Amino acid sequence: MDAFKQQLEQLSAKNQYRSIPDLVHQGRYITRENRKMLNMSSNDYLGLASNENLRQSFLQQYGGNFPSFTSSSSRLLTGNFPIYTDLEELVAQRFQRESALLFNSGYHANIGILPALTTTKSLILADKLVHASMIDGIRLSQCEFFRYRHNDYEHLKNLLEKNVGKFDRTFIVTESVFSMDGDVADLKQLVQLKKQFPNTYLYVDEAHAVGVYGQNGLGIAERANVIADIDLLVGTFGKALASMGAYVVCDQILKECLINQMRPLIFSTALPPFNVAWTHFIFERLPQLSKERTHLEQLSAFLRQEVEHRTQIMPSQTCIVPYILGENEATLAKAKDLQEQGYYCLPIRPPTVPKNTSRIRLSLTADMTADEVRQFAVHL
């Protein structure tokens, strides 16, 4: 046990020790240690998680005869229910693709897709700043991989030119909206690149984009009009859609490969049908949430400008606004100060972000008012 204790002490010395906070949620507010604060750290981008009207409308349609609260099994055994197929068909239809497949979480999706679809003769080329879950999936695949510099497509092209002919298939891996910087990948350019090389597939994670961007809330791929050109388009239900789980839209043959070879899918008890029914209910309504998307973009543009004025650093183009302070100690102190002012802001430190880029990740939601965000900016 001494070795474990020493590890924790080392984390504390570097201001990298983490703990799980005790929180009470009240809509867009959080209470911690008897202090009520505006939640500036949520991924509930459309503000749907505490929407009582939506919740009551969903419950009333069942009249007390609710879907099961558990699946009790993997979908490949006895854990499949009609609502799963209904949601997969709805997602595929909205994206105008052949098929969709559901997963228990974005993490399950990202650690399972690449190992299922690659061989030891495959190549993965991933953006330097892709999410930890994608990195874990790459490692589990046990195939050759390189990281291209963040959003540097000349570097990616060079890697493709040097390596594609040596491998049976190549996967380009990126997020659309990057979770820590809030900047956006150029999906049109990535599509053009992958079309130049044989047996090359594009895998895009839209976890922080689905619901928020695009005319119908289908993400950056919809906004860029490239949905049909992305081989594996992943999204999650646990952020803007106020639910749980994830999906991939893809060709039917890729779906069948995943069903047969993706371990997190095969060996996990499926999500509760009740949860999947709620996801279906929300996903149906995505196109009608344009007012929320517009309001969120207005709030985001204002806050990005305010933070850039103070730091001269603003990579973000989205509702994720990084307030980059650099050092761990300064970031922890500023987060504490903002919490004392009534704003639940959290420090993000290495290894989650690169060394010397510690930041407060400010995350806006559509249920915030313009006055609340303006008042917050005063305290920055």
From Swiss-Prot:
Residues binding substrate: R18, H131, T352
PROSITE patterns, sorted: AA_TRANSFER_CLASS_2
Gene3D superfamilies in the record: Aspartate Aminotransferase, domain 1, Type I PLP-dependent aspartate aminotransferase-like (Major domain)
Chain segments annotated as transmembrane: none
Coiled-coil residue windows: none
Catalytic activity: 6-carboxyhexanoyl-[ACP] + L-alanine + H(+) = (8S)-8-amino-7-oxononanoate + holo-[ACP] + CO2
Taxonomy, superkingdom: Bacteria
Positions of disulphide bridges: none
Binding site for pyridoxal 5'-phosphate: G106, Y107, S179, D205, E206, A207, H208, T236, F237, G238, K239
Keywords carried by this UniProt record: Biotin biosynthesis, Pyridoxal phosphate, Transferase
InterPro entries (alphabetical): Aminotrans_II_pyridoxalP_BS (IPR001917), Aminotransferase_I/II_large (IPR004839), AON_synthase_class-II (IPR050087), AONS_Archaea/Proteobacteria (IPR004723), PyrdxlP-dep_Trfase (IPR015424), PyrdxlP-dep_Trfase_major (IPR015421), PyrdxlP-dep_Trfase_small (IPR015422)
Pathway assigned to this chain's UniProt record: Cofactor biosynthesis; biotin biosynthesis
EC number from the UniProt entry: 2.3.1.47
Xref: CDD domains: KBL_like (cd06454)
Residues where N6-(pyridoxal phosphate)lysine is found: K239
Keyword GTP-binding: no
Alphabetized GO MF terms: 8-amino-7-oxononanoate synthase activity; pyridoxal phosphate binding
Cofactors (names): pyridoxal 5'-phosphate
PANTHER family, sorted: 8-AMINO-7-OXONONANOATE SYNTHASE, CLASS II AMINOTRANSFERASE/8-AMINO-7-OXONONANOATE SYNTHASE
Quaternary data: Homodimer.
Annotated function: Catalyzes the decarboxylative condensation of pimeloyl-[acyl-carrier protein] and L-alanine to produce 8-amino-7-oxononanoate (AON), [acyl-carrier protein], and carbon dioxide.
Protein family: Belongs to the class-II pyridoxal-phosphate-dependent aminotransferase family. BioF subfamily.
Protein name per UniProt: Putative 8-amino-7-oxononanoate synthase
Organism of provenance: Haemophilus influenzae (strain ATCC 51907 / DSM 11121 / KW20 / Rd)
Lineage: Bacteria, Pseudomonadati, Pseudomonadota, Gammaproteobacteria, Pasteurellales
